[in-house]
Amino acid sequence: MRDMLGLMKQAQAMQEKIQQMQAEIERLEVEGQSGGGMVRVTLSAKGQLRNLAIDDQLIKADEKQILEDLIITAHEDARKKAERLMEEKMQGVTAGLALPPGMKLPF
């Protein structure tokens, strides 16, 4: 019975930490870039596009396809950074828990 109570307290404390972490994650941003910084995207840690910056040199009609490819690459770069950032932040919250390998918490 004592073990069950301790487990419930641990679960409640973890839930509070997760809620705090979610609030912090909402405020975090990452930047991805491509083309040597000519295209930059800023994403929230959850992957929402917050800003797109394109160097003036790229805005030419005959380079439309290049620009589109660079935007996609910059977005993917930022998305990967956001994913790594969330994983790093959650490691502190889930430290000490016996989670199965590869298990991701729902955010």
Curated annotation (Swiss-Prot):
InterPro entries: YbaB-like_sf, YbaB/EbfC
Keyword Ribosomal protein: no
Subcellular location(s) per record: Cytoplasm, Nucleoid
GO annotation, cellular component aspect: bacterial nucleoid; cytosol
Keywords: Cytoplasm, DNA-binding
Predominant subcellular localization, coarse grouping: cytoplasm
GO molecular function, one term: DNA binding
Subunit (UniProt): Homodimer.
Stated family: Belongs to the YbaB/EbfC family.
Biological function: Binds to DNA and alters its conformation. May be involved in regulation of gene expression, nucleoid organization and DNA protection.
Protein name: Nucleoid-associated protein Msil_0275
Organism: Methylocella silvestris (strain DSM 15510 / CIP 108128 / LMG 27833 / NCIMB 13906 / BL2)
